[in-house]
Structure formats: structure tokens, C-alpha cells
Amino acid sequence: MAQQRRGGRRRKVDYIAANHIDYVDYKDVDLLKRFISERGKILPRRVTGTSAKNQRKVANAIKRARIMGLLPFVAED
């Protein structure tokens, strides 16, 4: 009989919790760019691996940065 593969996906690590970041600052554009796609959309939790609490912090910081003009609403072609 053929053997079956048993491969599970590795759980993604919450970047914010792993680096002990308490406050996600909207002015920290380099951090926020980790959580944005090439098209400028906020990446979901299943892609980034963040917890629900930290995902809310990231989403609010990204939205704030967009309003302040630090991040684009849409990607440039």
C-alpha cells in the first residue's frame, strides 16, 4: 500500500506579540507595510498570523495612516 503523507501547515507566528510591541503606531510605516498587500489592501489574519486583538490594532493603525496620507488607499500601477 502507498504511504500517505502527513504534512501539516506550520502555524504562523504573531509578529507583534513575538516582538513585544504594545502599541501599533500609525506613524511606523515600515511595520504597517508588513500587513498590506501589493495592491494596498489589509492582509487577513489567516495570511499574517496575527491574533484577533493585534489584527484590530493593525487595521486601525493602517486606516489612520491612510487618512494622514502616510499610506496609499490603493496601489500605484
From Swiss-Prot:
Q: Which Gene3D superfamilies has this protein been placed in?
A: Ribosomal protein S18
Q: Sorted alphabetically, which PROSITE patterns does this protein's record hold?
A: RIBOSOMAL_S18 (PS00057)
Going by the UniProt record, its keywords in alphabetical order are: Ribonucleoprotein, Ribosomal protein, RNA-binding, rRNA-binding
Gene transcribed to yield this protein = rpsR
List the GO cellular component terms: cytosolic small ribosomal subunit
Q: Which HAMAP family match?
A: Ribosomal_bS18 (MF_00270)
> Which GO terms of the molecular function aspect are on file?
small ribosomal subunit rRNA binding; structural constituent of ribosome
Can you tell me which family this protein belongs to? Belongs to the bacterial ribosomal protein bS18 family.
User: What is this protein's name?
Assistant: Small ribosomal subunit protein bS18
Bilayer-spanning residue ranges: none
Q: Which Pfam families does the entry mention?
A: Ribosomal_S18
Subunit field text: Part of the 30S ribosomal subunit. Forms a tight heterodimer with protein bS6.
Instruction: Show the InterPro entries listed in the entry.
Output: Ribosomal_bS18, Ribosomal_bS18_CS, Ribosomal_bS18_sf
Functionally, this protein is described as follows: Binds as a heterodimer with protein bS6 to the central domain of the 16S rRNA, where it helps stabilize the platform of the 30S subunit.
> What biological-process GO terms show up in the record?
translation
Write down the superkingdom of origin. Answer: Bacteria
